């Protein structure tokens, strides 16, 4: 079974005076939120010790992370951390924990369940 992926336009708000609109890939198979290196001004990111392997099992080069940015859609914003990655095909990838923030669900041995009330 292949992970689900889809695209949507969001606003990435790094600070009150630095934000941009971008088409992101939302990927149920991704383990981290990623932004293409070069999209974020250097004064906003910091050194990272994160490690990440791509879908084709190659080590991705991660030197920096961004911890205080928000992703916004229809004026609803979520603060989520990102790693900055060189040579990505997509400018921004949002991961499974981001999807879980929107709609909490649990993957268990016997299937996927959700509790919309808590």
Residue ranges, per PLM feature:
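Aspartic protease
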Residues: 3, 8, 16-118
